[in-house]
Structure formats: structure tokens, C-alpha cells
Amino acid sequence: MHIMEGFLPPRWAAAWTLAAAPIVVYGAKQTIDIIRQDARVKALVAIGIAFVFILSALKFPSVTGSTSHPTGTGLLVVLFGPAVTAFTATIVLLYQALLLAHGGITTLGANVVAMGIIGPTVGWTAYQIIRPYTSLERATFIAAVLTDWTTYLVTSLQLGAAFPAGDGLDAIIISALDFAAIFTLTQVPIGILEGILAAAVIGYLTRLGSETIESLEVAA
């Protein structure tokens, strides 16, 4: 879903950057706070960043100006919550834009909103609702799948808003649905596979009996 450099009109690029900035700053503060509370969390944050980086770098061609790939942020949001996920996803997206030409600087805000903010927040909300009624692995699976699919839905809306099929809200929706239809071909199976992987990883981490994991209340 990385929208490539220069693809969005300047006004949309600026709008998404302004929308993402305060949340990313708050996420940075939250990340610093949890690391200060327990230095061991730093290693877990680093592992989470690596997980997101590796999965989101596995890109497949999709809609013009974008790509299709796992996001990795579903696992991260289960571990740390939406704010920290927004900040860590920004680190990954910035690194990929600068060094891998994956995404872009002008489109960083839009990509952060989709992959780092709205997608993970939807997954985290679902996790919070269903966790009391199901196992940790099942809840994580659902969170990761919804995070992935929502990320691509948001990207479709971003592209639809930037390149509407005409004038008015209806034209934006029609264009967004066209983008979403193309994403669906690859992203439905990718999202399910990502959910399975995230559930396996969270299960493995909790079976280690890590005090750091327990301190994050993931296993609660």
C-alpha cells in the first residue's frame, strides 16, 4: 500500500502529513515512556520494527502508484497499542522511503495514516473487544487481519480522494471502490496469511514466559 513518491497531489500530501504528525509525536513520547519504565522493552520494540520492516518490504505490484504486501503492524499494535505503533511504523516507512525507494517522503504522511494509524487502531479495537471471549492467538489473528485489510481500505480511499472519477463525493467513492477491488485480489489472502503468522509469533512469545511480555499485559 506504499503510495510512491510524488504520486499524490501536493494538497493531499500536505493534508495527510498534518493529520499524521501529532499522533506520531505522541507515539514517540509513549515509546520513550515505556522504554524508560522497563529497558528490556527496547529489544521488543526493535524486534517489532524489524517484523514490520521485513513483512512490509515483501511487495507485489498492484494499483498504479502503490503496492500490495503484508503490513506487520497488527502484531505490533497487540504488543504496544496504537500510539507506539504509529511511531514505529513511521520509522519503518521513513527508512524504506529513503533507502529502498519504497513509498516516498511526500507521501509519508498518507502511508503513516493508513499503515501506522487507522489500520492498527481498527485492529487494536477489535482485539480489545474480542480478547475476553477468545484465546490470545485467535484475538491476535483477527486483529492482524483487520489491521491489514483496513490499511488497504484507507489507501483506496486516499487514492480515490486524490484521483476521483469526476466531481463530488460519489466520484470519490466510485474511484476508491475501483482501487479497493484491485487490492482485494491480492490482499484478502495476504491478510489471512499475515494473521496466521502474527498469531504464531504472539503465541511463541508468550510461551517463553517473558516478564517483559507480561508487563505489557498482552497475555492478560
Swiss-Prot record:
The chain crosses the membrane at residues 6-26, 43-63, 74-94, 98-118, 182-202. GO terms for biological process: cobalamin biosynthetic process. Gene3D superfamilies: 1.10.1760.20. Keywords: Cell membrane, Cobalamin biosynthesis, Cobalt, Cobalt transport, Ion transport, Membrane, Transmembrane, Transmembrane helix, Transport. It is found in: Cell membrane. GO terms for cellular component: ATP-binding cassette (ABC) transporter complex. It is a multi-pass membrane protein. It comes from the Archaea. One of its GO terms (molecular function) is cobalt ion transmembrane transporter activity. Pfam families: CbiM. Pathway: Cofactor biosynthesis; adenosylcobalamin biosynthesis. Belongs to the CbiM family. Forms an energy-coupling factor (ECF) transporter complex composed of an ATP-binding protein (A component, CbiO), a transmembrane protein (T component, CbiQ) and 2 possible substrate-capture proteins (S components, CbiM and CbiN) of unknown stoichimetry. Part of the energy-coupling factor (ECF) transporter complex CbiMNOQ involved in cobalt import. This is Putative cobalt transport protein CbiM. It comes from Haloquadratum walsbyi (strain DSM 16790 / HBSQ001). The lineage of its organism: Archaea, Methanobacteriati, Methanobacteriota, Stenosarchaea group, Halobacteria.
